[in-house]
């Protein structure tokens, strides 16, 4: 009986967690809403008339039931970024991958449970460029049975910061123009914090966000990069930040002056209000790792100490100088040093016996035109921009979603399962690449994984067009980042430096510009799962692929049946 006590204790904890779990019901109405920014009013696509959209707050073990009602003029789907959706790809959301989009006038109810996840995630549209304005935070708190954060200190308050991009025109028009011309899309006109550009933009200072703190208070900042196309540096004037979590996974705490987030990534930091009472800028601006045009403006909000009754001219002047304390736009060394400090809090169970050893080249490319420099060939030297993984530029299907076709056993005409595990040609990936390798093939290709297979992927950046930090997001999974380096990956020497003890767990990771990153995971979640660059111009150029994880043979190892209201194409 003594030997069974640990079992009964675990069983009691499990039952208690089920008793305390809640089901949260929400209605998301997708609609056009007048939004004024930068002196102009635009009819923006929003959820429930809010920009950014509603914040979802739940606990580990809770469930969400969200009915999306499309009253806008575009097809749409919603993705719950970072939620694993165990055996439930039908709730994942990327259009034409796990569902057909919700058409205007239609609706769909997303149902899913937070299973052993807690921290900061977010949700967003996963249809074309609609996530420019359709996004919000998804906060998962610890369960009531164990409600405290495993932080070195307990925060007094929490502040959620959604970093975004704003175009002074309809983002869908920006995308459509780029798709027509083959050129790069126009850059954004502003960055935003919780939808507001801040003091440094026209017609914006009155709406600059202010967050009150008391002297000595410890604040948990939940920072989310919801920008469409830009990695961002973020910092708070004169304040140190202690990183405690990333992508809803706890980390070993470490101190830094600045954090860097790629689109899709989240970082939780603790801030101690230990400076003289005043107003301090929170600021974010671009980290631009590519040889390409970018938005070089800076968004701000204000951290206001409660006992700073007013702002003197001198204090305001000092605050306006704060953005200069952010790193330079192309400071790859700072970005890499920040990412390198990420580690799990303790030893983790990393896959060691690899069943699938995959090598993916990721990068841009150019399609040659029969008649260069026409209206539809406005890319470099009369070409059209593209992007690929292993020389395959992904094409989204239209007549059915991949998951629906896979489940129905009707893949013909929708997708094939011949995605290459390695690039078709070996070359100097980060060197001077022959122009003959700049043009990929097009295809809707998936790669099959056996259930419970242990997977390693080397994501290798290339210098085709430009080297760049590509934030790669894997749907349906979290993975361990076991290694990273510059130049071409060398399996004979680089593998020995892998961190197999306490690597960080992420759902989105950047490939260093001109370098590589190694990730590992166990394929224990059956379904169709998209892997793609979270820079949206890149995914629509084709920087994506799909994993098809087969059903297992045991109990609860197969994909659930699709819901009755699943949209049809």
UniProtKB/Swiss-Prot annotation:
It comes from the Eukaryota. PROSITE patterns: MULTICOPPER_OXIDASE1 (PS00079), MULTICOPPER_OXIDASE2 (PS00080). Its main location: secreted. Keywords: Apoplast, Copper, Glycoprotein, Lignin degradation, Metal-binding, Oxidoreductase, Repeat, Secreted, Signal. One of its GO terms (cellular component) is Casparian strip. It catalyses: 4 hydroquinone + O2 = 4 benzosemiquinone + 2 H2O. Lignin degradation and detoxification of lignin-derived products. Belongs to the multicopper oxidase family. This is Laccase-13. It comes from Arabidopsis thaliana. The lineage of its organism: Eukaryota, Viridiplantae, Streptophyta, Embryophyta, Tracheophyta.
